[in-house]
Amino acid sequence: MIHIDLDTLSKMAEDSFKAIDPRDLAFLFASGKSEGFMRDQLGLFLSRNLSLSGDEHVTREWKKHDLTVMNGNQPLILVEGKSWICHDAYRKSKLLTDKKSIFQGSMGDVKKLLDTHDQYPKSSIFISTIIYGVDTSMNRDFARFNITYGDSHNKGIQSAGNFSNLVGISRSHASTLHGAFGPTRRFPLRAGSFHGMNVEADFFLTQIISSPSKNLKNEISQSIFE
């Protein structure tokens, strides 16, 4: 029976994303969120490269889970995925306190996974997040290219002082948040540029081992902002 640990799944995710042309990744991130495409890319890679046997298979949207490795009707591995811009991870409100914050999105995925895990306790469960940014400061006319969330990218760069600061701080915030949920791996995505604007992105993968503490939001807030 297939078993994949955190390091193996992270390495397979990294290998699957390396197959994407950096110019294509830049286009995807500049023109909108792309968690669906990245989910499909990972799913295809797992389906091709896992040593599946018998009734084992990879599927999407089983019981509304993003990606699942199954043995017949039994889930073995479940993965949920989200995508956010750097400016979201940079700001305390969007990172933690808003009703539609990164934290709330992650918590919702964790609760859904734990509910399924209660029914299938032998399954391994994971959450993932892509954090990406477009350096709109490199092109004063960025609005001409209809960058999705272009104004938000620009506000984040201005707030952080420059694009490098924005990427670094948002990466640190996302690392702390993910690490609070469980063992975490991170790797950069090889994104190129879009009409002269550099694109940066990171992939975070966390294995959920236990239920989050009731005070987790405050613990994350204290770790980052206090």
Where are these regions (language model features)?
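Long, charged, glycine-rich C-terminal linkers/tails
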Residues: 54-69
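Ampiphathic alpha-helical segments that act as solvent-exposed interaction surfaces
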Residues: 2-11, 98-111, 202, 208-226
